[in-house]
Amino acid sequence: ALVWADSFSQTLDGTGARAVVDVLEANGFAPIVAPDACCGLTWITTGQLTGAKKHLASLLSILAPFAASGIPIVGVEPSCTAVLRDDLLDLLPDDPRSLLVSSATRTLAEVLSALPASERHLPSLEGVEIVAQPHCHHYSVMGWDTDQALLESLGARVTRLEGCCGLAGNFGMEAGHYDLSVAVASHSLLPTLDAQPDAVYLADGFSCRTQAAQLAGRGGVHLATLLAGYSG
């Protein structure tokens, strides 16, 4: 398996990417970490599509050979994983490598769930309470049902938040957006964290972890971090 450590995972919080490698190794894979490469997410979210296409074209030259060899590409940051699964096909539709890479891209939960249950080497989460904040891109593009089913198969009790955390990448950091960002977080995320102070806060998205840390003083963990047995 190829672990695609996106720009967020390489520069802002590498815990999730390292844990993805550990979990894959424990489950019989020989993970390779992809060379440095950006998918252009920040260009996409700010409407700079010409720049985004250049970054994606460069990324394809790195990832396509692995995909062509049948090696799954495992994403770490949900928003970047969603770029490969969805935006890539819209931005570079005439490049045959786009469909190849998009089809090979998986979430960690998808890779693990494809293994027979008897071959999964994962910790018991019996009795563990989890408040899960699916990243909006994860929820809308890849879906989060596979993640929830995997967690529940390990014994976890999962409270799944349906709304946005409110940070939404750079949105909540931009001038004039702070109050709205906090209001969105106050709709679901913050009251649920307050009601379940002992629960593990599970959030694959860097934005979702940042929002909870800054507004509630609550640390969050990536799915891989939880499965690797880390405390976060």
Which residues make up each language-model segment?
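Iron-sulfur cluster-binding electron-transfer modules in prokaryotic oxidoreductases
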Residues: 1-232
